[in-house]
Curated annotation (Swiss-Prot):
It is an enzyme of class 4 (lyase). Lactoylglutathione lyase-like protein; part of the gene cluster that mediates the biosynthesis of terrein, a fungal metabolite with ecological, antimicrobial, antiproliferative, and antioxidative activities. The first step in the pathway is performed by the polyketide synthase terA that produces 4-hydroxy-6-methylpyranon (4-HMP), orsellinic acid (OA), and 2,3-dehydro-6-hydroxymellein (2,3-dehydro-6-HM) by condensing acetyl-CoA with two, three, or four malonyl-CoA units, respectively. 4-HMP and OA are not pathway intermediates, but are rather shunt or side products. Induction: Expression is under the control of the terrein cluster-specific transcription factor terR. Disruption phenotype: Reduces, but does not abolish, the production of terrein. It comes from Aspergillus terreus (strain NIH 2624 / FGSC A1156). Residues 1-19 form the signal peptide. Gene3D superfamilies: 2,3-Dihydroxybiphenyl 1,2-Dioxygenase, domain 1 (3.10.180.10). Glycans are attached at N82, N99, N140. Belongs to the glyoxalase I family. This is Lactoylglutathione lyase-like protein terB. The keyword Lyase applies.
Length: 197
């Protein structure tokens, strides 16, 4: 069975709904990776301001801009929005083993998106709860960088253990639109103890 990202399947559909031509060459970020694996390809973050969110995710968290990509087609049918062009950026780690083809954030700005008010004391909402990033030994440096940028809010930090061994330190911060972001301090061990590639 082919391992296509959901967006790869949606692009031709969106183009077909409007009769628009589909690009002859799909950008690298949308191509199926050579290495067979199953993973979340990308998460879409709807930003009220692309520039502020780029500052948070790129300057603050240290993600790379993989490419600028404007999603075009019948977005009214697909997403219920009142536009046919969705400006955005694919963000991720261009040095990863999958060369930026998984674990990617697609940062977009809908012209008619509704801002959902959030408060630090609010309990979690249903639906997408947070986006998590492996930080390795860069957790403190990342939190310092966010503080210098005046972004992220007050971090909530906790260390968890597995028996007597520390497992990882976690910090939650907020992106410019209030979405929860979890920063994890140990990138080489996942929550069930398997080595990452």
């Amino acid at each position: 069975m082919a391992r296509f990202a959901v967006l790869q399947l949606l692009l031709p559909l969106a183009a077909g709904l409007t009769g628009a031509s589909f690009p002859a060459q799909i950008p690298t970020i949308l191509e199926e990776p050579d290495t067979p694996h199953y993973a979340v390809h990308h998460t879409v973050v709807s930003a009220s301001s692309l520039s502020e969110s780029l500052k948070f995710y790129v300057d603050g968290l240290g993600l790379d801009i993989i490419r600028n990509y404007n999603f075009q087609g019948d977005l009214t049918t697909l997403f219920g929005t009142n536009t046919s062009v969705l400006p955005g950026y694919f963000l991720g780690d261009t040095t990863s083993v999958y060369n930026g083809t998984d674990g990617v954030i697609y940062l977009v700005e809908f012209p008619d998106a509704k801002k959902i008010p959030t408060d630090e004391s609010d309990p979690p909402n249903t639906g997408l709860f947070l986006t998590s990033f492996w930080m390795g030994d860069k957790l403190n440096a990342t939190l310092d960088r966010l503080d210098r940028l005046g972004m992220g809010g007050k971090p909530h930090i906790a260390t968890f253990s597995f028996g007597s061994e520390p497992l990882a330190t976690y910090a939650t911060v907020r992106d410019p639109d209030g979405a929860r972001v979890l920063l994890v301090s140990r990138p080489y061990i996942n929550s069930i103890g398997k080595q990452r590639p």
